[in-house]
Amino acid sequence: MDQKSLLFTPEGVRDIYGEDCEKRAKIQQGIHTIMKQYGFKNIQTPTFEFFDIFNRERGTVKSADMFKFFDQYNNTLVLRPDITPSIARCVAKYYEKEEMQIRLCYTGSTFTRLSGYQGKLSEITQLGAEMMNDASSDADGEIIAMTIECLQKSGLKEFKVDIGHADIFRGLIEETDLYEEEIETLKTYLNNKNIFAVEDMLENRDMPQECKNLLVKMPDLFGGIETITYVKEQTTNKRALKALERLEKIYEILAASGLEDHITFDLGLLSHYEYYTGVIFKAYTYGTGDAIVTGGRYDNLDRKSVV
């Protein structure tokens, strides 16, 4: 490369300087202040880890989307594509015998290959918080309430937090005869709101009609608390009903704090990360096509109850 070319950054990364850098620092500081007020303690994990921390069995990003390399012992290492699995590993190591609630927060870069995605970055800054050893709906509600406060602290006035539950889809899928590969295809159709493809896929499958009807309607199961009431009347699946009752409790918690205007329920919400086992949420605001916040409960990643 010539000297002039060395002034540029590789594709997918960028320099942040001047006013933009100052704004980012101010926003990060404000969010960190809210997290500290909620009792969260700082934690730092390595920028790269062993590949197995993020492999497919643990429900993170696809192997092809990771930046991988080898150490001198021929171990496969990756630049972290997500910080949550790193936190889970750290907690399993240092807090294995801890039974009391644990609250941890962090800031760091994540790295994902995004070939084919125009305008998206491979390196992004991730700010997050993890609450361990608390399986209650109160914990779910508190994390979402803190998310709303963090967004308000960032200066956002118009935003919505969409809330769903992983067990609604999983409960309905239990009643089907779909194979794992077919389930992944169905999830893609649902994420793309492709109702016609969903109908075509399920047309001649062996499953209860109520289950088929709800799966087809999933992309439209979006709205206020009345959406939960509607779906409860349409299914007898115990796993899905338990998830819906959980969402009702979360609504009551948030409504008691006057935060109900900031939330909607998306009962067809499916997460990119497979490790989520319970409540899932994403926050959106005007001018961005993607979620500005993603989160949820994962009780299997480190054998602890976490949101």
Task: Place the predicted regions along the sequence by residue.
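Acidic, His- and aromatic-enriched active-site or binding-groove loops in soluble protein domains
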Residues: 65-71, 177-200, 207, 259
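Positively charged, Gly/Ser-enriched RNA/tRNA-binding surfaces
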Residues: 20-38, 49-50, 69, 73, ...
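TRNA-binding/sensing appendages of the translation machinery
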Residues: 1-85, 141, 162
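Extended alpha-helical scaffolds
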Residues: 154, 167-169, 182
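Beta-rich nucleic-acid/ligand-interaction surfaces
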Residues: 47-64, 164-175, 269-277
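Phosphate-rich ligand and nucleic-acid binding surfaces
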Residues: 15, 174-177
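Short, surface-exposed recognition loops or helix-turn segments adjacent to catalytic cores
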Residues: 158-168, 186, 264-268
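A local structural micro-motif
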Residues: 41-43, 159, 181, 262
